[in-house]
Amino acid sequence: MLAKRIIPCLDIKDGQTVKGTNFVNLRQAGDPVELGRAYSEQGADELVFLDITASHEGRKTFTELVKRIAANINIPFTVGGGINELSDVDRLLNAGADKISINSSAIRNPQLIDDIAKNFGSQVCVLAVDAKQTENGWKCYLNGGRIETDKELLAWTKEAQERGAGEILFTSMNHDGVKTGYANEALASLADQLSIPVIASGGAGLKEHFRDAFLVGKADAALAASVFHFGEIKIPELKSYLCGEGITIRG
């Protein structure tokens, strides 16, 4: 089994880390530079920075903030939000990002996936998908979960893989911030049908939820925000628990 990854996520709004429930009711969760440094020191495997209102508000990700966070961590760093063209990717990689996460822009212009993969390599391109389970299956949403699209989760992630995405970051909007566990059934079907890594997001509340994401959901990595930001779960303790459950963990 490849080592599983634990990934804290900084959801950024107006330069501050925030956390909501089901994509709304945001509350402040701390200084992103300090949080990033702390997670890096505590043994997080990667860090994700999502400027959650950039696509909605139509502005560019905070390049300066990305630079400051990158200077304070020594783990792989993924940045997303408001990335619409190759010049955005170039700017953020130069600011210290290792990978770029695209979401709304890829749904509107799928060719962007091909272009990033061709120009920077598949390993740089993370397709983030915000999906909600409806009566008609899992539907993908745009602009931070504000607009439903006709794209279905499995079909869209398969297309992204074919276009050159190197990783899928799947957030279940039904589970986001609710802390009742990840969408393991959907995760497992993604893992079974894709050959690229899948990151689970949305729903972590207990250490057991991470275990289930790996063992039941077959995820390659598990991302969480509030349980880390508010000190409910500490990364070293989580890793030692997962090792005890027979899961291969980095570090």
UniProtKB/Swiss-Prot annotation:
It catalyses: 5-[(5-phospho-1-deoxy-D-ribulos-1-ylimino)methylamino]-1-(5-phospho-beta-D-ribosyl)imidazole-4-carboxamide + L-glutamine = D-erythro-1-(imidazol-4-yl)glycerol 3-phosphate + 5-amino-1-(5-phospho-beta-D-ribosyl)imidazole-4-carboxamide + L-glutamate + H(+). Keywords: Amino-acid biosynthesis, Cytoplasm, Histidine biosynthesis, Lyase. GO terms for molecular function: imidazoleglycerol-phosphate synthase activity; lyase activity. It holds the Pfam family His_biosynth. Its main location: cytoplasm. The active site is at D11, D130. It is found in: Cytoplasm. It comes from the Bacteria. InterPro entries: Aldolase_TIM (IPR013785), His_biosynth (IPR006062), HisF (IPR004651), IGPS_HisA/HisF (IPR050064), RibuloseP-bd_barrel (IPR011060). GO terms for biological process: L-histidine biosynthetic process. Pathway: Amino-acid biosynthesis; L-histidine biosynthesis; L-histidine from 5-phospho-alpha-D-ribose 1-diphosphate: step 5/9. Gene3D superfamilies: Aldolase class I. One of its GO terms (cellular component) is cytoplasm. Its EC number is 4.3.2.10. The keyword Glycoprotein does not apply. Heterodimer of HisH and HisF. Belongs to the HisA/HisF family. PANTHER family: IMIDAZOLE GLYCEROL PHOSPHATE SYNTHASE HISHF (PTHR21235:SF2), IMIDAZOLE GLYCEROL PHOSPHATE SYNTHASE SUBUNIT HISF/H IGP SYNTHASE SUBUNIT HISF/H (PTHR21235). IGPS catalyzes the conversion of PRFAR and glutamine to IGP, AICAR and glutamate. The HisF subunit catalyzes the cyclization activity that produces IGP and AICAR from PRFAR using the ammonia provided by the HisH subunit. This is Imidazole glycerol phosphate synthase subunit HisF. It comes from Bacteroides thetaiotaomicron (strain ATCC 29148 / DSM 2079 / JCM 5827 / CCUG 10774 / NCTC 10582 / VPI-5482 / E50).
